[in-house]
Amino acid sequence: MNASDRTPAELLRTALSADPARPLLTYYDDATGERVELSVATFANWVAKTANLLQDELSAEPGDRLALLLPAHWQTAVWLLACSSVGVVADLGGDAARADLVVTGPDTLETARGCSGERVALSLRPMGGRFPQPPEGFADYAVEVPGQGDHFAPYAPVDADDASLALPDGGELTGAQVVE
């Protein structure tokens, strides 16, 4: 970590420049036996593609709120960093009806339908697989993200002192607080 790293996205960029091959995230699913290990470079690529999807396809802007209705999963970590990259506030377990966008897994589709904005669904299947039948009214993340760019540049600078993460207890953290 550099003293200049003030947002999670900046922290990831520093890790990528230091040692892109280093393992960064290991995910285990005891129910399915799935194990996923992502290097810094692979994780950063998923984040870049997801941030491009957010910014270019879903028209998300800094300050927008994204209700993140996902369980503890490696793809949840990707979405958290992608939101930070764009300047979107990731609202963990947030109210879909009050959010500008919603990202959901298969178990929270009905709750996510309350969002009048863009809706993205993740199957949470091994290796980031697609839904066998895409849920009506949702973009299937596994279909939409592969074609996105491998590098991300925000249209507007992200301020480390702006809200970055909304917590289930109602508290909020800035990007700088998340890094601390």
Residue positions per predicted region:
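Long terminal accessory regions outside catalytic cores
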Residues: 1-8, 29-33, 42, 75
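ANL superfamily adenylate-forming
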Residues: 101-180
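Short hydrophobic beta-strand segments
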Residues: 24-27, 62-72, 102-104, 165-167
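Flexible, charged surface loops at secondary-structure boundaries
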Residues: 17-18, 59-62, 94-100, 113-116
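Conserved AMP-binding/adenylate-forming
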Residues: 36, 53-93
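ATP-dependent adenylate-forming carboxylate-activation enzymes
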Residues: 70, 91-101, 106-108
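A short N-terminal helical cap/helix-turn-helix that marks the beginning
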Residues: 2-26, 149-160
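Conserved AMP-binding/adenylate-forming core of the ANL superfamily
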Residues: 25-60, 157-180
